[in-house]
Amino acid sequence: MTRMAEKPISPTKTRTRFEDIQAHYDVSDDFFALFQDPTRTYSCAYFEPPELTLEEAQYAKVDLNLDKLDLKPGMTLLDIGCGWGTTMRRAVERFDVNVIGLTLSKNQHARCEQVLASIDTNRSRQVLLQGWEDFAEPVDRIVSIEAFEHFGHENYDDFFKRCFNIMPADGRMTVQSSVSYHPYEMAARGKKLSFETARFIKFIVTEIFPGGRLPSTEMMVEHGEKAGFTVPEPLSLRPHYIKTLRIWGDTLQSNKDKAIEVTSEEVYNRYMKYLRGCEHYFTDEMLDCSLVTYLKPGAAA
């Protein structure tokens, strides 16, 4: 496998990204537990078949990503933005692989270490408190589930180049991300960016995901192809995110008193606005969620 030379990164930029991530994910583990399922998975679930519980659908989503990677025992899987560790645990248990997780959240890092330590395996398991910009070790496969929203448009070329260079000739990667549409695309579908929509987007990127910026599916494809990947047709998960958000919102609402107790009424109201608002805009086809697969030449052949 080819190793990529380390690329210097601004200390200010790194510090800012740490602050942005921790502003959201380090609110309180107890708070997130009030609306997440037992897997502690904070991304779009996959309700296939439709009668799955949220927990079952979260495992189905993880499996949907992992099954696209052609994992073999002994391979090393890199999980960029590894959350609370469910994807890594699933990969070790299903495919007998080594795992490396990257996170910028101190709370997630601590929980991941506990999750990985509890797995009965001789495979290597590690979680690093760092971003992808500072990672250059060779790996066989890469998965990234809803971390891409935090990377920034200006960093997409560097991200895909780095991922391409640290994998072998048959490398595979999946990236799942919430996505938005270009105004021209919305106009073609009879939609337009209203003041209300713009205000909600501003709320999301300032109060919920500071520093976040949604890509379009086209951007995810084009930047991946520019780096040398072959990109099959992306998969839209929009109906599944609508259901996920509805369940999260209903569950948090049913735990209102506990949520206020572990955080504050202001935090509770902010997250209810976020969950209900996102459900609305996904339903209204203003937002989508794309699962994109990236194949190096040896995998695409």
Swiss-Prot record:
One GO CC annotation? peptidoglycan-based cell wall
Residues at the active site: C278
The knockout outcome noted for this protein's gene is:
Cells lacking this gene result in a decreased permeability and fluidity of the cell envelope due to a drastic difference in the mycolates pattern. The parent strain makes three types of mycolates (alpha-mycolate, methoxymycolates and ketomycolates), but the mutant contains most exclusively alpha-mycolates. The mutated strain grows more slowly in the lungs, spleen and liver of mouse and is cleared more rapidly from the liver than the wild-type strain.
Gene Ontology MF terms: cyclopropane-fatty-acyl-phospholipid synthase activity; methyltransferase activity; S-adenosylmethionine-dependent methyltransferase activity
Q: How is its activity regulated?
A: Inhibited by S-adenosyl-N-decyl-aminoethyl (SADAE).
Arranged from A to Z, the UniProt key words for this protein are:
Lipid biosynthesis, Lipid metabolism, Methyltransferase, S-adenosyl-L-methionine, Transferase
Enzyme kind, highest EC tier: transferase
Read off the InterPro entries from this record: CFA/CMAS, CMAS, CMAS_actinobact, SAM-dependent_MTases_sf
GO biological process, alphabetically ordered: lipid biosynthetic process; methylation; mycolic acid biosynthetic process
Q: Where does S-adenosyl-L-methionine bind?
A: Y42, S43, G81, C82, G83, T103, L104, S105, K106, N107, Q108, W132, E133, I145
Q: EC number(s) per UniProt?
A: 2.1.1.-
Specify one Pfam family: CMAS
Write out the pathway annotation from the protein's UniProt entry: Lipid metabolism; mycolic acid biosynthesis
The protein's role, per its UniProt record: Involved in the biosynthesis of hydroxymycolate, a common precursor of oxygenated mycolic acids (methoxy-mycolate and keto-mycolate). Probably transfers a methyl group from the S-adenosylmethionine (SAM) cofactor and, subsequently or simultaneously, a water molecule onto the double bound of ethylene substrates, leading to the formation of the hydroxylated product at the distal position. Involved in the activation of the antitubercular drug thiacetazone (TAC).
**Misc. comment:** Susceptibility of M.tuberculosis to the second-line antitubercular drug thiacetazone (TAC) requires primary activation by the monooxygenase, EthA, but is not sufficient to hit the lethal target. TAC must be secondarily modified (methylation) to its lethal form which causes growth arrest. MmaA4 activates TAC by interacting directly with TAC or with EthA to produce lethal TAC, but the methylation of the drug appears independent of MmaA4.
Quaternary structure and partners: Monomer.
Q: Which family does it belong to?
A: Belongs to the CFA/CMAS family.
What protein name is recorded for this chain?
Hydroxymycolate synthase MmaA4
Q: What is the lineage of its organism?
A: Bacteria, Bacillati, Actinomycetota, Actinomycetes, Mycobacteriales
